[in-house]
């Protein structure tokens, strides 16, 4: 087998998902290689999807680098899924996690913009709230965190971010550090009406009680 120094360094991106008990959903992850202009997909690699050491499924990444495994949650709550690359001669990548948020559809859902939660900088900042340049992310506004904590007691929350999908893990870590309520994080594509398209998709999936925060 090739040594780790000879293998490509890949990046796993796993996506949060909303679900209801007893209904199948797809667990989705991408295996990518960062490029100068855009990430390139790594196809033909085995990805393992696990929960607390139990195998949920495994499958090959397609030509687009994406792998999907069907999963049916049984009870309301949060399921943390770990995704990792199987033994490979070509690729090495750090494992990552995503959440399956199993909810009751009767409860309202409120969309929260991650960017709106960031404290205003003392000087102009032309970058995104969570740049990949290594700059330290700003903290959240303390009052916003308190308000979200109260809101989360009577509604489900979903976070949307304009950050690139490659930054999802960093965004989740940032949310944890700032003690935001644990909720799914969805990246928006850098295209016009991206949030509207996501809303349409969620409503087609049966999430009809979503509104903006």
Language-model-detected regions and their locations in the chain:
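C-terminal cap/substrate-recognition subdomain and adjoining C-terminal extension
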Residues: 129, 133, 141, 158, ...
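Beta-strand-rich structural segments
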Residues: 19-39, 47, 83
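Short amphipathic beta-strand segments in non-cytosolic proteins
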Residues: 46-57
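Edge beta-strands of extracellular beta-sandwich domains
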Residues: 90-101
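Short, aromatic- and glycine-rich surface loops/edge beta-strands on solvent-exposed regions
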Residues: 75-89
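Asp-based phosphoryl-transfer active-site loop
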Residues: 108-125
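Glycine-centered loop-to-beta-strand initiation motif
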Residues: 60-73, 77
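Beta-strand-rich domain onsets/edges
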Residues: 1-26, 100-104
């Amino acid at each position: 087998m090739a040594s780790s120094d000879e293998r490509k360094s890949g990046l796993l991106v796993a996506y949060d998902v909303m679900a209801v008990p007893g209904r199948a959903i797809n667990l989705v992850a991408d295996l990518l290689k960062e490029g100068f202009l855009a990430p390139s997909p790594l196809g033909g690699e085995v990805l393992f999807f696990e929960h607390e050491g139990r195998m949920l499924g495994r499958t090959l990444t397609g030509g687009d680098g994406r792998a999907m495994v069907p999963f049916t949650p049984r009870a309301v709550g949060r399921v943390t899924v770990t995704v990792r690359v199987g033994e490979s001669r070509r690729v090495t990548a750090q494992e990552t996690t995503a959440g399956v948020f199993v909810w009751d559809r009767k409860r309202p859902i409120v969309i929260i913009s991650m960017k709106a939660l960031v404290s205003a900088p003392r000087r102009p900042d032309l970058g995104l709230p969570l740049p990949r340049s290594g700059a330290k992310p700003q903290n959240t506004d303390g009052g916003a965190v308190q308000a979200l904590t109260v809101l989360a007691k009577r509604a489900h929350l979903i976070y949307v971010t304009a950050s690139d999908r490659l930054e999802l893990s960093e965004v989740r870590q940032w949310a944890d550090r700032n003690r935001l309520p644990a909720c799914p994080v969805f990246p928006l594509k850098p295209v016009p009406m991206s949030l509207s398209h996501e809303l349409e998709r969620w409503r087609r999936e049966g999430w009809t009680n979503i509104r903006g925060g």
